Structures are given as C-alpha cells and as structure tokens.
Amino acid sequence: MRSLTRQSPCAKMKLECSEDQMELQTADHLVLFGCIDNRKILCQCHWICSRKESRIMMELDVENSYYGQKAKKLFLEGYNCSQSVFLAFEDKYDMDHSMAMKLSSSFGGGMGRLREVCGAVSGMFMVAGLLYGYDEPKNFEEKSEHYARIQELAGEYRERNGSIVCREILGLGKGKVDPVPSRRTKEYYQKRPCPDLVAMAAAIMEEYIRENPLEG
C-alpha cells in the first residue's frame, strides 16, 4: 500500500494517508482522512491542478494565534465551544462577561447539543455580528455585505474541516440527541477534536479582523 502525502492549506500540516483512504469527491476537491495525535480528522483541500480558478484561503498559524489559543484554553476550562470562541474576543466588544457567557451558552454542541451548526462556528458568527454587523433592518446593502462576510467565514472553516455541521465533523449519526453534555474527562479530550476546532475558528476570526481592520 503506497503512502501519499498532501499538503493541507489550513494549518500547513502534512497528512499521511494510504490510497484507499482517499476519496476524490469532485474535480474541485480532495478529501483526506488522516490521523493527528491519535484523532481521526477530515481535511478538505483544493485540488488545485483541476481548477482554473481556486479560492484563496487565509494563511493561518493556529498554534501562534493569540485568540485561537485563548479560545482553546477556555474550552479546556469547561466552557462550551460557542462560549470559548465568543469569550476569547471579549476585549473587542463592550459586554459584561456574565452576559456574554449566557448569550453564547445555547449554541454549544451544535445548537444545544442538537449536533447542527458547529458551536465554534456560531461563536465566530456572533463575534462577526458584534464587530461588523448592521443595525438598520432596511439597509439592504449592509445586510447583503454582512451575509457575504458570514458566508466567507463559514467557507474558511468548511474548507479546513469538510463541514460546518457538528455531527458531520465529529462523524456522528442522526440518532436520538441527548441534552446531557459529556463529562470533561481526560478520555473526552483525547477523542474529541473540539479544542483544536475552537482554536481554528477563533484564528479564522482573528485573521479576518487583521485583514479587515475595525474603524476607530
């Protein structure tokens, strides 16, 4: 079995995988299955040579991202995925810590553990809304601009993880959902990629802010 290596555009990491573990989904993308720190991961990468135009992704250095590592630290302290990303950016918005924590509390586990949109993504969207969102409901241009922004952020996350949906990222089925959160044990952190996912979401938001400076 021949081992193949592809360079992931996300964290500049190489994934080792055998030919039979690779699946060419479309002419545009290659999905790689690999293993990092004993965790199975999915990384969706551009199949550049088959495209005349490819979407240019952000260059991320998650390990050295201030907000990324702050979000990861919060998650390891017990905050849920949405809270971890949202609270990591507390220095960017004017909101009481308790209120910010409560506001973002419903989105953990893919919306109250429904395993829908990843909580890290929801937290990223909330930060984007506070920093760049519109406050005039009839302003069509601002609304369109903000939705485009959200879709861009979602695209950055999806390109790196194959999906923005919790159950798909974690490889879960569509069985009965349980509202009881998992105990944060050593085993939990060993099998879940969530600490790295919140770090990635926060790093994406950090890079977006760097590329799109806030006024004032």
Provide a role label for each language-model segment:
Residues T5-Q7, D20-L24, L30-F33, K40-C43, ...:
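N-terminal amphipathic/hydrophobic targeting modules at extreme N-termini
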Residues K12, K40, Q44, R51, ...:
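Short, positively charged and aromatic/hydrophobic N-terminal segments
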Residues Q69-L76, F107-R115, K186-K191:
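A short glycine/serine-rich beta->alpha loop
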Residues L87-D91, V127, F140-G216:
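Amphipathic alpha-helical interface segments
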